Amino acid sequence: MCIRDRYMFETHIEQGPILEDAGNDIGVVDCVLGMFNYRLKFYGQTTHAGTFPMPKRRDAFFAASQALCYLHEEIDKLGYSDLVYTTGEVVCHPCVHTCVPDFFDFSFDSRHEDPKVLEKVLAIVKSCEEKTWAGCTCKVEKAWNRDTVYWDKKLVSYVKASAEECGIKHQYIHSGAGHDAQFAAYMLPTTMIFVQSKDGLSHCEPEYSSPEHCTEGATVMLNAVLKADND
């Protein structure tokens, strides 16, 4: 990361496979995608796992699994190849192997550049409240959301020019992950530079970016900072 006078540059690993798949070493980042996170909560009835007949059950875990499959099917029908969505956190109660769950809660995170696309996704998410799932009710609650943050166009051009002058293969790319720079962008001109992540892996032990790729990122940032300093 580099802050000089009125600019901010942040170099970061891509955390995805796009650069590696394209055979490019540097990502000229133009924005951080808009995103939202909601919680879907399902309410059923706890009963004994061995004594309560299947047709009479109100299994909140099973209800949530039906809803999650519904979300995947309906959102995929929208046809946006660059849209991503994830369920990464779940809560189950009473979470005992001898009990049918009476409560299940899962997170739903979705990200895209266009707010109109996210509105379509959100409409599908909210529709879960209107349905009964395996005899259970569903409540949809907003956790947080953020709008797409675009980087300063002049700084982005400096990053691209720097990569070109250094003879480093590069491409424009969006950031699907949130970064410190997106908050700085509300206060001063900001941009980012991505370097390759091996196999696109991040937030896990195999996460790796080679010293060579990191050096390229630092070189591109240095030259971009010098361009901004001479502006």
For the regions a protein language model found, what residue spans apply to each?
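Short beta-strand/turn micro-motifs at beta-sheet edges
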Residues: I26-D30, H93-T98
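Glycine-rich beta-alpha junction loops
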Residues: I13-P17, F36, T46, H112
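A short beta-alpha structural unit
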Residues: T86-C95, S107-E113, T137-V156, G176, ...
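Alpha-helical metal-binding/catalytic segments enriched in His/Glu/Asp
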Residues: F36-F42, T51-I75, F108, A184, ...
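Acidic-enriched catalytic cores of C-N bond-cleaving enzymes acting on peptides and small amides
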Residues: R6-F9, I18-G23, D30-C31, M54-E89, ...
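Short beta-strand segments
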Residues: M8-E14, K41-Y43, F194-Q196
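Conserved small/polar residues in nucleotide/adenosyl-binding loops
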Residues: M1-D5
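Zn-dependent metallopeptidase/amidohydrolase metal-coordination segment
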Residues: K169-V220, V225
